Curated annotation (Swiss-Prot):
Keywords: Ribonucleoprotein, Ribosomal protein. One of its GO terms (cellular component) is ribonucleoprotein complex. The gene is rpmH. Residues 1-23, 29-44 have a biased composition (Basic residues). This is Large ribosomal subunit protein bL34. It comes from Alkaliphilus metalliredigens (strain QYMF).
Amino acid sequence: MKRTYQPKKRQRKKEHGFVKRMRTTSGRRILKRRRLKGRKRLTA
């Protein structure tokens, strides 16, 4: 059986990227929370 995590840069960006987060209201909320928390990296 293969492992569940098969990393792909494009897929990762498409699912968890900055642009995707900015598109939705909930995504913007996530970014806002991460900024407040002081995260060095906001998205993948």
